[in-house]
C-alpha cells in the first residue's frame, strides 16, 4: 500500500448493506415464529416492531439519496429542527403493533429495494456532501443501512438464543465484516 486512504464508494456501501441485511434476515428466519410478535426483543419491541423500525430507517437513507439526486441534500434534516428520533421510533413501533407481520415485512422489503436501487445509480461524489444536520451522506447511509442492520442482528441473535449480552466477539466480527466490505 502507498499510504493512500481509499475513498468510500456507493458500491462498497451497497455490498456491505446486502451482507448485513442478509445476516439480519437469516437471524430473523432462525427465530421461532411464535416469538416474532412477542414483546421484549428491544425494550418492549417484538421482531415485528424491529422490522418496521429497520424499514423506516432504510427508507430514511433512501430519502437522503433522493435529496442528493435533486441537489438539495443540505436541506435534508433542516426542514424539521425539532426532529425527535425516539418519538419517530415510538410512532413506527406503535403502527407496527397494529399491523400484521406480513405487511411489515413487505414494507421493509420495499424500503430496502428503494435504497438498493438508489445506491446502484448514485454518484460517489455525493458521499462527502452534508445534510442539514451536518452529517455526510456516507454517515447517513452507513448508520441507517449496514451498521443499523448489523446492530439489530446482534439483538436478534442474542434474544432468540437467550444470550442477553452481546459479546465482545460480536463486536470484533463486526469490525472484520466492515473491513472486508470496504476491501
PLM features per residue range, with description:
Residues 2-9, 91-97:
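Short, contiguous pre-domain boundary segments
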Residues 3-33, 56, 60-67, 147-150:
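Alpha-helical bundle segments that constitute or directly flank the non-heme di-iron/ferroxidase center
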Residues 4-15, 70-76, 103, 140:
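Solvent-exposed interaction patches of small proteins and small membrane subunits
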Residues 6, 97, 101-108, 138, ...:
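Short capping loops/turns at secondary-structure boundaries
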Residues 11-18, 51, 55, 102-105, ...:
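Short amphipathic alpha-helical segments with heptad-repeat character
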Residues 22-26, 30, 110-117, 121, ...:
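A generic structural signal for well-ordered alpha-helical segments enriched in polar/charged residues
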Residues 37-86, 124-183:
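Short, contiguous alpha-helical
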Residues 83-126:
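Acidic/histidine-rich alpha-helical segments that form the ligand environment
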